[in-house]
Amino acid sequence: MEHIRLPLSRVAGSAAALLAATATLLLPLAAQAQEVTLRAINSFQEGTYFARQFEAFVKKVNDEGKGIVQINYIGGPKAIPTMEQGAALRSGVVDLANTTAAYIANLVPEALALNYATRPFSEIRKNGGLDYLNKLMQEKGLYYLAKTGDNIQYHIYLNKKVDKPDLSGLKIRIAPIFRDFFTQLGATVVQTAPGEVYTALDRGVVDGYGWPAIGIFDLGWHEKTKYRIDPGFYTLELGIQFNAKKWASLTPPQRAFIEKMAAWVEETSAAASITDAATDLKKQGEVGIETIKFNDAQAAQYLKTSQDAGWAAIEKASPTHGPKLRELLSAK
């Protein structure tokens, strides 16, 4: 058989063309390999105040993160009930969640310390407080990325009047962060998911609840609320938590992009919280919610009790880490 010899230049040219064509075909695949899609859940009903900052974060990530990171936002408690989201996050059913330490306290009780902090969150980042907490959280499969709510205090809301810091005889809805404080005030404590509080108030299952200065109008609770106790106590902790393995699996550019988005949401939410809290407190008065104010001595003791109760619970649950967290999170 006769062999046909091609000029070397033609062979080289054909090989180069083949390589170029292959590279062109692989470009979209390479781009896809660098983009990750994350599944996200929200502990709060879509569109409500405590959901909206996270929803803005999701939108910004999806708008600016094409080719790097995208988020598939599957919704709020209707998708996965609030109290089941911590387990879903830890197991990898979802990759990130807008939630609170209160809802993962069974996994990482030390995380509740963020509510008792008296240092600004920016300082807690700088002084190693967040890194210290994240070491504990990562041991339980979680990673704390960013706060989506700050500069907002909690209050006790009631449908029965009191004239001193004594809740004896009252049934109060709690989250884990309030349990010891409210118990020391004499309350009978009841724990329910936020979506069940309106019905509990309506049926007399509870006489009041602990909640931040913002948010009761979204949930309709103002209809069943007559009083708010001042002063406020603790500081709202609401943030974005990751599944630790998923966070570790991201590429450096992906993590850098998400951290940039996290810094944006922390800055915007912290600024908005100050004005939004003032607006909501004013609105509460306008719809007839009366303010209960204690005298100076009672107010001082009330706040001291709140801090002592909170930190005592942390140190009891975590004798090794509680004192160090208090040192890092509490102002001198």
Question: Which ranges hold each PLM region?
Answer:
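Bacterial N-terminal signal peptides that target proteins for export
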Residues: 2-19
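Signature of the catalytic double-stranded beta-helix
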Residues: 125-138
